[in-house]
Regions:
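GNAT-family acyltransferases
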Residues: 1-90, 103-105, 110, 117, ...
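Conserved beta-strand-loop-alpha-helix junction that forms the acyl-donor binding cleft
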Residues: 113-123
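Conserved active-site tyrosine of GNAT-family acetyltransferases
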Residues: 126
Length: 157
């Protein structure tokens, strides 16, 4: 896969992926498949300055998106990730997370993942890469997982 900064002109291609309701069924915002709702999501992604369009290198078509958000001195959140259903069960998410985490750890000590409490699919994926559930974090409909730079290097997923 290839990840590059998201651009305004990517809206139509990314919405073609995002308009599948099943992508959003476990996300806190179940209605992101609707164009108006996705347009707001896309606008926030652009405003974040850390959003990426994820492309399949073979087809050169968009297959998803993710972004860096909420930078602090030690930590960066990686989130708002979604992929076309045809990518589920393959290595796309793992590859993307590896790229993003490796990049983040050039500048920060910890990667944070905030996931909807009922999003079993995303929680399982993050646990597979070695992120640990933060039992001290507030439970506000979301759970927080953290991955330390030292653990990432040791795990080498």
């Amino acid at each position: 896969l290839r990840a590059r900064p998201l651009k305004n002109e990517d809206f139509d291609e990314l919405f073609a992926v995002a308009r599948d309701p099943l992508i959003w069924e476990q996300h806190p915002s179940h209605d992101r498949y609707q164009e108006k709702v996705f347009r707001d999501f896309f606008r926030a992604a652009m405003e974040s300055g850390g959003a990426f369009l994820v492309l399949d290198v073979k087809t050169r078509y968009a297959i998803g998106s993710s972004r860096f958000v909420n930078l602090t001195a030690d930590e960066v959140e990686i989130g708002y990730t979604f992929f076309a259903r045809r990518c589920w069960g393959h290595t796309y998410n793992k590859e993307l997370k590896h790229l993003m985490i490796a990049h983040a750890f050039r500048f920060r000590e910890t990667a944070l993942f905030v996931i909807g409490e009922d999003n079993g699919r995303s929680r399982a994926a993050i646990e597979k890469i070695g992120a640990a559930l933060d039992p001290e974090a507030p439970r506000d409909g979301a759970v927080r997982y953290r991955l330390a730079k030292a653990a990432f290097g040791a795990k080498g997923f």
